[in-house]
């Protein structure tokens, strides 16, 4: 009996450290469950974020469409009523809110933008003149930015295609270009300094061409030279500062919204608003 007892109590003792290293089966289940639950939460959170981004993008496109629809029947601002201007302003502010405060990307800004609407008096007056004068037409109006490789400024060209139908081709008989350099003064404000006004790309109509060089007669060297001179004619008028040391004529321009296909701007000081859409590159 003593031997049995001795044999029993002489068995090796179980180490406490070994016991502690053994994880209960139930605890492993809970740990794995927590891991799976965390993964599910992360996936669900990612899917929710993606849906929010998509919803925001769709909402933005709808708001941009609403803005373009609001300006559609205003003849680029010429015939806009006070009620229409209020609706347009509200739509403008809504779109501006989608990327308000973001830095302007010069790569996106670079290129040609076609005017869809403006309330700027110095542009609307051109449309008014064209509506009243039968011998004067205003075609497309563009802003052309050259700033891809710069972060502090660049060149901006305001381009107006116009015509005298009795002498020039319809809508695109000639091009008026107002060139300015601009400096970036804040994340969205740029200061324009106008440098030059030019008239170029003169395209006379067929009737005038026939008068200068009739098709039924051999075209003389003089008539051909005259046609070539008209086509390549370019008149330039510099816009200089009124006195040494002062800036040339200019103004502050606030770029209130920019993406790949829409540009919104405001001329600071009550000079009007502008709605542009991206256009094909314009060669000048």
Swiss-Prot record:
Q: Which InterPro entries does the UniProt entry name for this protein?
A: PAP, PAP/fibrillin_dom
Compartment(s) of residence: Plastid, Chloroplast, Plastoglobule
For this UniProt record, give its keywords in alphabetical order, as a comma-separated list: Chloroplast, Plastid, Transit peptide
Q: Does the keyword Nucleus apply?
A: no
The lineage's top-level taxon is: Eukaryota
One Pfam family here: PAP_fibrillin
Annotated GO CC locations: chloroplast; cytosol; plastoglobule
What residue range does the UniProt record give for the transit peptide?
1-40
Read off the PANTHER family from this record.
Answer: PLASTID-LIPID-ASSOCIATED PROTEIN 4, CHLOROPLASTIC-RELATED
In the record, the note on similarity to other proteins reads:
Belongs to the PAP/fibrillin family.
What is the protein name stated in its UniProt record? Answer: Probable plastid-lipid-associated protein 10, chloroplastic
**Which organism does this sequence originate in?**
Arabidopsis thaliana (Mouse-ear cress)
Lineage runs: Eukaryota, Viridiplantae, Streptophyta, Embryophyta, Tracheophyta
